Amino acid sequence: MLWGLVVPMILYAARMVEILARPDIPFDSLYTYLPLARQLLEDFSKMFSQPESYKVAPGAVIYMALAGADPVAVKTANLAISLAALALTFDTARRIGGRVAAVAAGWLYALPHMLVEAGATLMGESPFVFLVALWLWATSCAAQARTGRRAAAVQTATVVLAGLALTCATLTRATYMYWLPFAAIVCLALATRMQGPARSAALRIAAIHVIAAALVGAYIVRQNETFGRPMVATGSGAALYFGTNPVLSGYEPPFFGLAHDESTVSDGLGHLSLEGDRRLMEVAKTMLRELPAKALMKMYVRKLGAVLFFSRAHLDRHVLNDRAWRVVLVLLSILGLWGARRHAMGWVVGGAAAYQCAVHVPVMYNPRYSISALDVLLVLLAAQGIAWIWSRQRRHAAAACCVAFLGAGIALGSYHQRHSRALLADFHQIPAVAIAVAADKDLHAQGWDSNPFDAAARMTTNTATVDWTPEQPLPQDMITMVHLGMTRFEGQCRRVWLTQRKEGATRSTSISLEGLRQGQDINWGIHHVQLPEGGKSWHVQLRFECSPGTLMQFEGMGLYQASAGRYFRQKALAPKE
């Protein structure tokens, strides 16, 4: 108990302090969650009848309202429920796989950075993770066979608690909404083929999901009666719209230096308004119909890899980064699935993990969604994997093989991060619209043995620059990209710096080019380098950092927009507007 739970809890709390001490408040909490929580405190009866209430799932708002809508109080509550989630995960692992699994779960929860960040950040992740941990713990209690006079009462209580926890988790983040009926039906179907304690456990797990499905369904019916739409909250339209955008590989736009372009569809209504959400959903459905199946599947495979192992778009370059921890958790989870295959909870946790992967692939990629959805589940499964290794007769040999296997996985993940295809916007599926095209006389290339705009040229040193200085300032927008066409490329580049200068003011951003391939253009948003409008002078520079001798040939430079909303809007909305 001391080394398996108490010490990990102390370590976890100590690691949370730095994040809890940050004075900044995330955008969504500052402008959505906290204001709604204050409205809830002012007038509870009217809050859920106002249009603002459908913009987010109610769980996070109620949680922050219970803390007085005070950021310090919410962070304090985050610390408390995060430690409780760790303890619940510890005991759930013990009930499934014994003491070794419990100790492993405690350390696997506390050591990686992901759940520390999710638990401490002032957002909806912390209550969601806690409620998922509570649901899994109560379900593990309900799945256990009990004897004695109070057995029926205890099992009934844990079934009800698990159902309520799963309901609250779904109303905090609605990702489990489709899981509820699916799991209930599967458990009922399996129960018809089972006998004895296994059948009873399957029926109790089915009852948990029936309770949650009924309560969440009642809330959805209430939303339909109040606002005319069956939903937990809006936001699914934007999530699918950005997640299907082939220009950005389904990633959130800031990963490419862009702002969100939902206004091209919502016309200022807001992506969380009923009409804005409907429009974005229609455009997303049109994209799914129009995009080639091969391109869509290729994007989904890449996103599945990002959901499981994170993306190079936000990973640091250390070998033991978040991807390394995910590799460890996923590989150990595979062993854990095998080790817990005869326990009902092994199927519940494994099924939930597979489901969460599936529902997060089509929607907008952001690592915090993956962390809150998967990490508790993976910790539980990975703990079972360690317990399974420990139970082998030749445990030391099994452990050595496992360590070697994990090391190889980490090395492969690190290699992929450094050498996979560079993450740049792609104009192949959606034609880009030119905002301004650079004239030849306004372009100046330096650092190559000849002009790369005329013919293929090699870099003479490890840096080279392309400067664009138009005669007049050019129009800019937060969804505009700098485009540098590249028809030839051979060699290796580390990064390119995008810099904008205007009358003495300068802003720049670094773009990773590791893994740049022949056929890729340099496309990057100017949102992070925008300067105030006005003035006469305007200058854009791309400064490459590549190996000497790298061969490049360019084909024009300019400002372009490749908005999926503008391109698909007419097909999706014209008959309905």
Regions found by a protein language model. Give the residues of each.
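Start-transfer (signal-anchor) and selected internal transmembrane alpha helices
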Residues: 1-17, 188-193, 197-212
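Transmembrane-helix signature of polytopic, membrane-embedded enzymes
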Residues: 3-4, 86-111, 129-130, 150-152, ...
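Extracytoplasmic catalytic/substrate-binding loops of multi-pass membrane glycan-assembly enzymes
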Residues: 21-36, 45-63, 69-72, 229-234, ...
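Multi-pass, polyprenyl lipid-linked donor-dependent membrane glycosyltransferases
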Residues: 27-28, 51, 55, 59-60, ...
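Membrane-interface anchor segments at the N-terminal boundary of transmembrane helices
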Residues: 72-73, 286-349
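Transmembrane-helix motifs of polytopic, lipid-linked glycan transferases
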Residues: 76-97, 134, 138, 331-335
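Membrane-interface alpha helices of multi-pass inner-membrane proteins
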Residues: 105-106, 110, 155-173, 214-217, ...
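Membrane-proximal stem/loop segments at transmembrane-domain junctions that anchor or position
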Residues: 227, 231-303
